[in-house]
A protein has these predicted regions:
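Generic structural motif
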Residues: 150, 176-178, 198-200, 224-226, ...
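Intrinsically disordered, low-complexity regulatory regions enriched in Ser/Pro/Gly/Thr
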Residues: 135-139, 162-167, 185-189, 210-215, ...
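Phosphorylation-prone, low-complexity intrinsically disordered regions
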Residues: 1-142, 157-167
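OB-fold/S1-family single-stranded nucleic acid-binding modules
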Residues: 222-257
């Protein structure tokens, strides 16, 4: 009987240790994220939270073509051709220091893991850090995508009785990577997702920054919230956290041609 009690105690200790490790990993992951591009990204690394795919953090090294030495007509982080650039490539690359460059296609792959890597398991008793999902990467990640089909101004319906409805707009986000635009007449499903941008009473919001922008602009969005696909749809929806978490890089050349 004493041996069975000892085995039971060891099992309890083992479970307690595993739960403590998960909590520490979750806390570490949360503390590794920035709220805006003006903040310095975490330089640490936790191998237990890295994906099995070969993903590296910036800054990245790109070989510029002879006729475009400063990448005025191409954004290599998104592999997207530009008609007009708003932010110099060197500045974009500086913002990518210790951050992951993520495409819509890659984000679909990450969320398909249900917030887990081979070693990292999300604590379901805690709110998900990235909305309805937790991207199993230590530190910041940046989504690159082209804004499309921006809606008219909308207002939220469900608000407290003493609060005014919140302004917002919806749009599509496209992955105009030349890998896809050179092959497909119509973009495949993993290259398209939705975005919601809401007005905020606490400082300048992504809505304020993007409301007057035209369709076809290439965006870089830092650590956005991710929402599950709506019923009857396979498309994910993301929402930027603030104006500081969004960069408008330029106007995509191939927008409207796919």
């Amino acid at each position: 009987q004493s041996s069975s009690l000892g085995a039971c105690a060891e099992n309890v200790q083992g479970r307690d240790y595993a739960q403590r490790v998960r909590r520490e990993s979750n806390d570490l992951l949360r503390s590794s994220r920035s709220s805006g591009f003006d903040q310095c990204a975490q330089t640490g690394r936790n191998e237990r939270l890295e994906l099995t795919e070969d993903m590296e953090r910036g800054p990245y090294t790109f070989e510029a073509p002879l006729d475009d030495a400063t990448f005025e007509r191409f954004e290599p982080h998104a592999r997207t051709k530009l008609r007009k650039r708003y932010i110099p490539h060197a500045s974009v690359n500086a913002h990518m220091n210790c951050r992951y460059a993520i495409s819509p296609s890659t984000l679909y792959s990450l969320t398909g893991r249900s917030g887990s890597s081979s070693e990292y398991v999300r604590d379901v008793s805690q709110p998900a850090m990235d909305g309805d999902f937790e991207v199993p990467l230590y530190g910041d990640w940046v989504l690159f995508a082209v804004m499309s089909e921006k809606s008219a101004l909308k207002y939220t319906n469900k608000t407290p009785s003493d609060a005014a409805p919140t302004k917002y707009f919806s749009c599509k986000l496209l992955d105009l990577n030349t890998q896809y635009t050179n092959i497909y007449h119509e973009l495949p499903g993993h290259c398209v997702m939705n975005m919601l941008a809401f007005e905020s009473t606490r400082g300048t919001s992504a809505f304020d920054k993007l409301w007057k922008e035209r369709d076809g602009v290439l965006l870089a969005i830092l650590n956005p919230r991710i929402m599950r696909a709506r019923k009857g749809s396979n498309e994910l929806t993301i929402s930027p956290r603030s104006a500081d978490s969004v960069l408008v890089l330029g106007l995509a050349e191939q927008y409207g041609r796919c």
